[in-house]
């Protein structure tokens, strides 16, 4: 019954580019081809072939011979055999006894159903799809579509405006967040610097404690030397007294010997006058010479003892000054140790405070980033409701509070130059104090170098080397820029800092 032809159904010109270019825009159709049609309005089993065209939302049909004219002229006849409006129609496949690829078109305003049939399943599917699509075009849908388009355009403009505003805010907040992230990285770097300075403080405190122990040992050695010198002074005093007593005895003996020599000479002279033989007097002269030699020896020993006493007195005085010097140095080291301990505790408190501030800043950053992500999701979401708008307003309020706090912190940081200026003044005063201390220590060192070294100095060369090493460490620390800046910061935060610091930090 079927006489199928491959060109019985032609696709829409929108599917064939060559045909669409050749047609006039007013004559373009969606689909055309030959279908089987059963008579409308009355029951009949007869099927006839007709040439059908789908134009917009209408189905036009002609006699089968019209197909050749349409394909030749590319214009359809404006006088069809019939026109079927497809708007609101229900199109569905249906199987008939003699037509397995039939299609039923029904509408509530139609007095019956319209039955059409294709010659293959492919043609049936193609016509069903195009008929169903054309059935969606109605006057009501057109009016509703125009109103919906206008409403969507207005909503789109409003959403685009809001999106642009939120994007501007988002860019500003992103820049602020980048600035906060940079500040957080700077805080981490400062934390590392503070950790290094804390380590330096601990090393300096340990060195000062070792130096204090060394000075204590030196003081004990000096005290022992002082005791030895005092004992030696006592022994020399006793020796001097003994020598003085011996000299006095020898003087008395010499005087007696001289008196005896004088008597002998007088006696010899008397005997000479009487022409008598003189007795020998050599023993007395030899005795006198021995006494004189012994007196000379005793005088030399006395001078030597006096010289040693003077040396001991000088050593005693030097040891006493040395003891006072080490006592002052020990007291200075003790004060420095206490100050460094206090500074270390202050630095630890500041470090803990900075860590706490950093943790609070990180928490606020996380909250701000979460609010920012939520706001971005709300902006990118196509579904808008009251709950999402309230959540977006809450996120915007949270970000507003966050950036207001950032502005207040920036205002506080703007006052930092005044504090730095005051810290420079404190640095100059501290430099003058350090120079004064170094000058006094240099003078004391010069006086010590001019003085004859004592036994304790002679036996403590290693301690002097330790002192020189400590001086070198102090010089290196004084040349360390970060160390000085941390010291100035600690001095600026001390309760005894100048009032200008407190005014600058308000």
Swiss-Prot record:
Domain PH residues, every copy: 28-136
PROSITE patterns: PH_DOMAIN
Record gene name: PLEKHD1
Modification Omega-N-methylarginine, positions: 503
Coiled coil start-end: 146-391
Protein known as: Pleckstrin homology domain-containing family D member 1
Tagged with keyword Acyltransferase: no
Keywords: Coiled coil, Methylation
InterPro entries: PH-like_dom_sf (IPR011993), PH_domain (IPR001849)
Family that this chain belongs to: Belongs to the PLEKHD1 family.
């Amino acid at each position: 019954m079927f006489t199928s032809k491959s060109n019985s159904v032609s696709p829409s010109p929108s599917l064939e580019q060559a045909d669409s270019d050749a047609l006039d825009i007013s004559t373009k159709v969606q689909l055309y081809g030959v279908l089987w049609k059963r008579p409308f309005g009355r029951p009949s089993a007869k099927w006839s072939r007709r040439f059908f065209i789908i134009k917009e939302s209408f189905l036009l049909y002609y006699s089968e011979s019209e197909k050749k004219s349409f394909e030749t002229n590319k214009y359809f006849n404006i006088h069809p055999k019939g026109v079927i409006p497809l708007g609101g129609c229900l199109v569905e496949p249906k199987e008939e006894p003699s037509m397995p690829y039939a299609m039923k078109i029904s509408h509530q305003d139609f007095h019956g159903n319209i039955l059409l049939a294709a010659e293959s399943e492919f043609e049936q599917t193609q016509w069903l799809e195009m008929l169903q699509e054309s059935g969606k075009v109605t006057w009501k849908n057109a009016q509703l579509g125009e109103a919906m388009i206008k409403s969507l355009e207005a909503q789109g403009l409003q959403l685009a405006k809001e999106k642009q505003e939120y994007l501007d805010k988002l860019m500003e907040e992103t820049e602020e967040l980048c600035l906060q992230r940079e500040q957080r990285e700077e805080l981490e770097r400062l934390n590392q610097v503070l950790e290094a300075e804390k380590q330096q403080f601990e090393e300096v405190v340990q060195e000062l404690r070792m130096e204090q122990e060394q000075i204590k040992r030196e003081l004990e050695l000096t005290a022992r030397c002082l005791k030895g010198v005092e004992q030696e002074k006592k022994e020399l005093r006793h020796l001097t007294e003994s020598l003085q007593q011996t000299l006095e005895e020898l003087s008395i003996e010499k005087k007696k010997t001289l008196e005896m020599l004088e008597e002998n000479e007088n006696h010899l002279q008397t005997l000479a006058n009487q022409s008598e033989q003189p007795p020998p007097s050599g023993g007395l002269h030899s005795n006198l010479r021995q006494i004189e030699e012994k007196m000379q020896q005793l005088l030399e020993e006395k001078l030597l003892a006096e010289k040693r006493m003077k040396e001991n007195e000088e050593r005693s005085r030097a040891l006493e000054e040395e003891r006072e010097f080490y006592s002052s140095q020990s007291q200075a080291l003790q004060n420095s140790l206490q100050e460094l301990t206090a500074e270390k505790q202050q630095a630890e408190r500041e470090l803990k405070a900075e860590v706490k501030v950093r943790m609070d800043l990180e928490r606020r950053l996380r909250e701000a980033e979460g609010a920012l992500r939520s706001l971005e999701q709300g902006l990118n979401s196509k579904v808008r409701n009251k709950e999402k708008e309230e959540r977006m307003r809450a996120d915007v309020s949270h970000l507003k509070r966050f950036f207001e706090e950032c502005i207040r912190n920036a205002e506080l940081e703007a006052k930092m130059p005044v504090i730095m200026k005051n810290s420079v003044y404190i640095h100059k005063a501290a430099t003058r104090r350090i120079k004064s201390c170094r000058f006094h220590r240099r003078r004391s060192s010069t006086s010590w170098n001019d003085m004859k070294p004592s036994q304790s100095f002679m036996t403590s060369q290693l301690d002097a080397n330790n002192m020189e090493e400590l001086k070198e460490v102090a010089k290196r620390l004084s040349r360390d820029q970060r160390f000085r800046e941390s010291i100035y910061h600690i001095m600026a935060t001390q309760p005894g800092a100048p009032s200008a610091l407190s005014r600058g930090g308000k």
